[in-house]
Design a protein with these regions (language model features):
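Alpha-helical scaffolding within the catalytic cores
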Residues: 22-32, 142, 213-220
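Catalytic domains of cell-wall/extracellular-matrix polysaccharide-remodeling enzymes
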Residues: 70-157, 250, 255, 259
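Metal-dependent polysaccharide deacetylase catalytic core of the NodB/CE4 family, i.e.
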Residues: 15-97, 163-192, 227-244, 272
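Alpha-helical structural signal in soluble globular domains
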Residues: 3, 7, 31-35, 81, ...
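Hydrophobic alpha-helical membrane-insertion signals
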Residues: 8-14
Length: 272
């Protein structure tokens, strides 16, 4: 958040259920909301914590795998805890996958929700290349840009007003569509550290022109969409682990995110 703010950017802070029990995390979110205008959102990832395990007797975090009865109970617990800590309900939520029944329930029960990160693993035609028995192909075929999901199927855009689920859904990351023809694409995206995971940088200079080129490709979509373009840069604290990640040292992790924020900040200052 600090790096984004230094570059004149606002962020969406996705609070997890576990973080709602952390006074320091709540105070940081409140401060950045009041001072910088950051949005405080509610993620349905990060469910596992002592309180969750005691009630639901599981370490599973995949809300789409629970029964509908449990989904409703979890949503109620998480949303009400959020309200207790912040005094309002969130306008956006998200998970790695949000099935239609879950989305419909959230919109009906908490109508303030307008937006949700509703899918991830949007790799496309080569998604099968990295499937295993924990993920299968549940996420294959997720849309690549914002869409209005159908009440019947999250991955299907609503065909008309009757099918409109009442929210705008967005993908977890903005992937490189071209790269997905050669592989599953999860190492290629506008997330700076996806670029590191894909080893798409100069190991001597720690520069990554690919990142800026891909961001510009997404910006160019405005030419074909009445001036509108969409791009996501989704990052959590774990992506800047002091012990390193993806075989990269902390210094490179930090630099990539800092440079990414600086590039977006530069574009904003230029009115782009």
């Amino acid at each position: 958040q600090r790096l984004a703010h230094e570059n004149g950017l606002k962020v969406t802070i996705q609070m997890t259920y576990a973080s709602l029990f952390n006074d320091e995390a709540v105070e940081i979110a409140k401060h950045d909301h009041d001072v910088y205008g950051d949005e405080i959102a509610l993620s349905l990832l990060g469910l596992p914590c002592e309180e969750f395990r005691e009630k639901y007797k599981t370490k599973d975090f995949c809300i789409w795998m629970f029964s509908m009865e449990d989904k409703k109970a979890i949503v109620n617990d998480v949303f009400e805890k959020f309200h207790d800590r912040f005094g309002f309900y969130p306008e956006s939520t998200g998970s790695y996958y949000m099935d239609a029944d879950l989305t419909n329930y959230i919109k009906a029960t908490y109508p303030t929700v307008k937006c949700a990160v509703a899918t991830c693993w949007e790799e496309g035609p080569k998604a099968y290349h990295t499937c295993n028995n924990s993920w299968y192909t549940l996420f294959d075929g997720g849309p690549w840009a914002p869409w209005i999901p159908s009440k019947q199927n999250t991955h299907a855009p609503a065909a008309n007003a009757a099918e409109d689920s009442g929210i705008v859904a967005i993908p977890h990351l903005s992937r490189d569509l071209i790269a997905c023809y050669d592989g599953n694409g999860s190492n290629f995206g506008t997330h700076p550290q996806n670029v590191l995971r894909g080893m798409i940088y100069d190991t001597k200079t720690w520069e990554y022109p690919y990142l800026y080129n891909l961001i510009d490709q997404y910006r160019s979509l405005g030419k074909y969409n009445n001036g509108y373009a969409y791009n996501m840069m989704f990052v959590g604290p774990g992506w800047m682990n002091k012990m390193g990640r993806w075989e990269q040292p902390y210094e490179l992790l930090y630099k990539s995110y800092s440079d990414g924020c600086a590039y977006y900040g530069k574009l904003k200052k230029e009115g782009k």
